[in-house]
Amino acid sequence: MPTSVMNLPIDMTTMSSQERLEKMSQLPKIELMEEEEEEEMKPSSDNKIKFNISELLEDDRKPTTQSSPSASSEDSTNEIEQTAFNFNFDPKMNPISALLQLQQTFLNVGNQQNMISPLTMFPFFGLPTAQLMHFKNMSNPDVNIQSDNGEEKDEKSEGKDGETRDSTGGSPLESDAEDDDDIGRGSDDEANSSDPSQNRKKKTRTVFSRSQVSQLEMMFECKRYLSSQERSNLAQKLHLTETQVKIWFQNRRNKFKRQAQTDDTNISLQMHRANVFSIPATTALTSPILTIPTTSAGVNMRNMISSPMDASATAAARFLFGFGTLQAQQNLNASAQAQNM
């Protein structure tokens, strides 16, 4: 080969001109031959190995499909999955449009394979707002528990109110005194009942007219406790039921007890003020505000009015109207006595 010859050192000085020309003419050919050899060393496009991952996987599965018939169904589903999720993404595409296209692809895949949801990794695709709100409520179970407990408490409170009202409406043959003692016990017994319908019952409040209230007040002033016969007669007279009369008397007795307790505190306060700001009888003067009226016959009205609270009322009046005027009157009296002496 000429390449072996060219590898030897060439001495151009010993050559003739003709030989030089021949050697010079051979040099470009050698370069061309080297370029051809380099091209032969490079792999041509025809000799490149062409392969696809899906084809390789199919070639690997071919012997298994021939051996087992059950694997054919699995291969078919795998092929569907491989072809279904092919998504051609264009880098120049708008991100919003790409997301919409991806969502549409997932929806199509879910419809083809009869899937409940398109993809478990994207649970927000294709879900209505009602389900999202349901998931939101499920994420906060404490709120639901608290609301349920609040409703149960309201129902229990309403049930207790209704039961106390029902307990007050017992048999009309019993006396009112026994009914007052059995109010708490009857409500406790009925609170243990397991019927939820009784707890939800609501009693309508009875509205009494003025004439009915006045008659009931007059009867209450005469008698605090009524027998069954008296209660039935009064109910027939006022066009009310015996239960309504009985409940009214119970409420009125409770109100009277509360008023008595408040009156006791007021009386004790008045007595305390009377003891602190009391004036001796020898130095006490008659005030025009506190003068006791007399009749035409000269009879003092104090003797006609029997009230054990005269001293306390006088002391309270002194406290309310102030001690400035009383002190001034005492000073005048002292100066008058000094002049008389």
From Swiss-Prot:
A biological-process GO annotation: regulation of transcription by RNA polymerase II
Keyword Transferase assigned to the entry: answer is no
Q: Which domain of life is it from?
A: Eukaryota
Tissue specificity note: Expressed in a subset of head neurons, including AIM and ASK (at protein level).
Q: Where is this region: Disordered?
A: 1-78, 139-209
Q: Which residue windows does the record flag with biased composition (Polar residues)?
A: 64-78
- Single GO MF annotation: DNA-binding transcription factor activity, RNA polymerase II-specific
- Give a short account of what the protein does: Transcription factor that binds to the promoter of target genes. Regulates fate specification and/or differentiation of multiple cell types arising from the embryonic mesodermal (M) lineage and the ABp(l/r)paa precursors. In the postembryonic M lineage, regulates cleavage orientation, cell proliferation and cell fate specification. Regulates hlh-1 expression to specify coelomocyte fate in the mesodermal (M) lineage. In AWC neurons, initiates expression of ceh-36, leading to the expression of terminal differentiation genes.
State the family named in the UniProt similarity comment for this chain: Belongs to the HMX homeobox family.
PANTHER family per the UniProt record, alphabetical: HOMEOBOX PROTEIN HMX
User: Which protein is depicted?
Assistant: Homeobox protein mls-2
State the taxonomy lineage: Eukaryota, Metazoa, Ecdysozoa, Nematoda, Chromadorea
